């Protein structure tokens, strides 16, 4: 029923975000990002309203600082998508075991929409990081425009590494 879904949404908002007090301009960006996140066939489809993902195949966004602290890495993932074995929040995710590729949103979202949804993720789900600005998205979009296809985890880690990523390839 509509009332119970509104109550669930309100409970989720209270529990997961925003994680800091935002000024009026940043709150507007946050709300735009929340709306982009919730669009059909966008982030919410796999990562869920609460950011917990779909275990055991879709990694969580909750308390996920290792993947989202680097602005450029996060923007590249959202623009081009990501495929390959990885560790997120202490768990191993592997395409050989059913983990789908992260969708590439570069052709679907404008710079301001992408910046807003990344800001929403960085300021929700227990994450408390600075916003991503549209000019940063534009810069990374231009730098990666000739790249075709998903980023593999190996390629992304060579450009924007997370310490210890090499061990992910050997985990079972």
Where are these regions (language model features)?
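Flexible coil segments in periplasmic/lumen-exposed cytochrome c-class electron-transfer proteins
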Residues: 1-28, 89-93, 97-100, 104-172
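Sequence/structural segment immediately N-terminal to covalent heme-attachment motifs in c-type
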Residues: 12, 26-54, 66-80
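Short, flexible micro-motifs
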Residues: 36, 54-56, 84, 93, ...
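Structured segments of extracytoplasmic/periplasmic soluble domains
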Residues: 36-40, 49, 64, 77-81, ...
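Electron-transfer interface patches adjacent to heme c in soluble/periplasmic c-type cytochromes
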Residues: 41, 60-88, 97-115
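Short acidic alpha-helical/loop segments enriched in Asp/Glu that coordinate divalent cations
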Residues: 49, 54-60, 88-91
């Amino acid at each position: 029923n509509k009332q119970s879904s509104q109550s669930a949404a309100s409970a989720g908002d209270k529990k997961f975000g925003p994680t800091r007090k935002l000024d009026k301009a940043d709150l507007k960006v946050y709300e735009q990002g929340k709306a982009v996140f919730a669009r059909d066939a966008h982030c919410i489809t796999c990562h869920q309203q609460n950011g917990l993902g779909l275990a055991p195949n879709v990694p969580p966004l909750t308390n996920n600082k290792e993947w989202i602290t680097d602005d450029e890495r996060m923007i590249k993932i959202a623009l081009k998508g990501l495929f390959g074995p990885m560790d997120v929040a202490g768990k191993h995710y592997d395409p050989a075991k059913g983990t789908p590729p992260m969708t590439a949103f570069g052709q679907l979202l404008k710079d301001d929409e992408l910046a807003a949804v990344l800001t929403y993720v960085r300021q929700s789900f227990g994450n408390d990081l600075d916003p991503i600005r549209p000019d940063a998205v534009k810069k990374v979009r231009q730098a990666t425009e000739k790249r075709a296809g998903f980023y593999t985890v190996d390629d992304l880690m060579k450009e924007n590494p997370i310490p210890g990523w090499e061990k992910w390839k050997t985990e079972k």
